[in-house]
């Protein structure tokens, strides 16, 4: 069934997206391969946070430069994503260690009861790494959207300074922010429908302190923060880099 769905996906991407659609298809499976590599390296005992950072960098390179080419738009987006990744990593690390997130929920214990719990691995690092991997896609998407829009503004406007270009980037970011926030929110809530049915008789305090719910709620809030931070950072980086490149090309 997965093969059939993959073929349908490929045909739709080929029909609608043409060459870009084919690149998107193979980039998707390349990203999936990176996730598999991430899991394999964790299973042999490597630090989950370091692996996650490497995977995030490789995913950013894959999504930006393979799909969109190596140009001033993608360079601006790449720099912006790396800055946000470092900022979010610091925030996630502090919260993860202080909140002591990680481990298994009561529902998971039943399915893994036959296995040994002595895996000798820091589950807090696993969750921190998972947060980084989960947020990177949204940040990349927002960043390249803003950078591409700013590049279009610059190419179609004869006279514009860095402040005006920055403002245009911020306006684009504000336009897509609400959509991004809603997408992230409903993606989380949809996974918790079964959870809410399971605990429909529980108090609000019990649910808000439940391990699985808290971990995913933290992930959601961090994703919100990353989606917001990427807007001014991309707008600023792109306003400087794109305008600088434009001035150099005109002078030559």
Question: Can you describe what each PLM-predicted range is?
Answer:
Residues 162-177:
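Helix-loop junctions and hydrophobic alpha-helical segments within the transmembrane domains
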Residues 42, 99-120, 197-217:
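Membrane-interfacial helix-loop-helix connectors in multipass membrane proteins
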Residues 89, 93, 175-192, 227:
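Hydrophobic alpha-helical transmembrane segments in multi-pass membrane proteins
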Residues 1-107:
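N-terminal transmembrane hairpin
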Residues 137-153:
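Short helical (or helix-break) motifs at transmembrane helix termini and adjacent helical loops
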Residues 80-81, 117, 121, 125, ...:
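Pore-lining and gate-forming transmembrane alpha-helices of multi-pass membrane transport proteins
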């Amino acid at each position: 069934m997965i093969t059939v769905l993959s073929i349908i996906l490929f045909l739709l991407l080929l029909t609608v997206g043409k060459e870009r659609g084919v690149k998107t298809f193979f980039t998707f499976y390349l990203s999936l391969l990176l996730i598999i590599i991430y899991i394999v390296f964790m299973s042999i005992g490597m630090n989950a946070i370091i692996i996650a950072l490497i995977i995030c960098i490789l995913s950013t390179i894959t999504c930006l430069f393979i799909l969109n080419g190596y140009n001033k738009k993608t360079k601006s987006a790449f720099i912006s994503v790396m800055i946000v990744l470092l900022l979010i990593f610091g925030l996630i690390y502090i919260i993860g260690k202080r909140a002591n997130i990680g481990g298994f929920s009561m529902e998971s214990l039943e399915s893994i009861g036959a296995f040994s719990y002595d895996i000798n691995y820091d589950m807090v690092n696993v969750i921190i790494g998972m947060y980084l991997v989960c947020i990177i896609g949204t940040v990349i998407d927002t960043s390249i959207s803003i950078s591409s829009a700013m590049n279009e503004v610059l190419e179609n406007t004869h006279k514009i300074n860095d402040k005006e270009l920055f403002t245009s980037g911020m306006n684009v970011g504000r336009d897509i922010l609400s959509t991004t926030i809603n997408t992230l929110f409903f993606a989380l809530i949809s996974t918790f429908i079964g959870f809410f049915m399971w605990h429909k008789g529980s108090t609000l305090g019990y649910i808000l302190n439940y391990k699985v719910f808290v971990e995913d709620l933290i992930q959601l809030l961090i994703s919100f923060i990353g989606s917001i931070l990427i807007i001014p950072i991309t707008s600023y980086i792109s306003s400087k880099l794109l305008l600088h490149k434009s001035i150099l090309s005109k002078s030559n």
